[in-house]
Structure formats: structure tokens, C-alpha cells
């Protein structure tokens, strides 16, 4: 997205509508060179994605906060931190739902957080779900790019040969 300015909003639908309107009044209108994205970090952002689609061009999933809020646990609290896991079915269903709803109207979806670089199976889940981009820590970029390329190559080979892993888990919303 070189040369494209973006503005990320972590808010409710009504607030999003107001902010986009105020931005337009100030000369910041959505277009080819200015994109408005929503930080999808709270469950309501996912649940109401169909309504947010009217006001945004894309979503950036904040996987750390989204996981914490979907699972109702604090990853920094030793008493419950063992529950915190981006690979949890509820988190994956939320992520896939957002990708599907966003893509149904031509919106872009990115994810930021450690999970794609820490858990290869989560990286694979994201790719199979259609994620548009992943943002990871600088020290894991090379590893994650290589991992993603290997996963994409395997998916293509599986499609060509009719072999490979079959998804059995229900990820539908």
C-alpha cells in the first residue's frame, strides 16, 4: 500500500459513521489514496462487520486484544493466562467470520500479533481463510514469509492432486 494513507478506527458503528462524516467535512474523504480501516479488536467489531462495511475500506485484526476479549481472560494474569490462545475455536470462528463478511463486499483484512509467527497452524488457518496480509514482529518477518510461502505451495499442490489435509472442524459462525 505504498503511497496510500490509512486511518484505523477502533469504535462502534454509530461513532464510525460520525468520524467518517467529520473526516469528509475536513477534506479527508475515502478514495484511492486514502483508506479508512477499522481496528477489529473487540467482539462487536466482528459481529457487526456487515454494518461497518459501509464506512470502512478494510480491517486490521488486533489478535492479542481480540483473543483476550473473546475468551474473557487476561494473558498477563497468571491465574487465567493458560486459557489465552489465539488458536481457540471461538477466536478462529470470529476471525474467519470477519474475513468472509469483509471480503463479501471487497474489503481488505489484515492481522497483527504474534500468533502467525508462533503457531504455524494458525498461520495456515489464516491463509486458508483468505487473510490479505499479516503483520508480525520484525525479527519474525523472514520466518513468517517463508512459512506462508510453504503453506501456500502445499495448499496449491493439495488442490492439484486432490490430496492433503481435510478440514473437519466446523469454523462457521
Language model segments and positions:
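Short, small-residue-biased leader/transition segments that mark boundaries at the very start
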Residues: 1-9
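Active-site-adjacent beta->alpha loops and helix N-cap segments on the catalytic face
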Residues: 10-22, 90-94, 142-145
Amino acid at each position: 500500500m505504498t503511497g496510500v494513507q490509512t486511518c484505523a478506527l477502533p469504535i462502534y458503528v454509530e461513532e464510525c459513521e460520525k468520524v467518517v462524516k467529520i473526516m469528509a467535512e475536513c477534506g479527508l474523504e475515502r478514495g484511492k489514496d486514502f483508506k479508512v480501516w477499522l481496528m477489529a479488536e473487540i467482539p462487536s467489531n466482528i459481529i457487526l462487520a456487515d454494518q461497518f462495511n459501509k464506512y470502512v475500506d478494510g480491517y486490521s485484526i488486533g489478535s492479542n486484544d481480540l483473543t483476550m476479549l473473546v475468551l474473557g481472560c487476561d494473558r498477563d494474569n497468571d491465574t487465567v493466562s493458560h486459557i489465552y490462545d489465539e488458536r481457540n475455536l471461538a477466536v478462529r470462528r470470529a476471525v474467519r467470520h470477519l474475513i468472509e463478511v469483509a471480503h463479501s463486499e471487497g474489503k481488505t483484512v489484515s492481522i497483527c500479533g504474534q500468533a502467525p509467527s508462533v503457531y504455524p497452524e494458525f498461520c495456515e488457518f489464516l491463509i486458508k481463510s483468505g487473510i490479505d496480509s499479516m503483520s508480525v514482529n520484525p525479527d519474525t518477518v523472514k520466518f513468517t514469509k517463508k512459512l506462508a510461502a510453504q503453506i501456500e505451495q502445499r495448499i496449491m499442490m493439495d488442490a492439484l492432486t486432490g490430496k492433503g489435509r481435510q478440514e473437519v472442524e466446523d469454523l462457521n459462525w
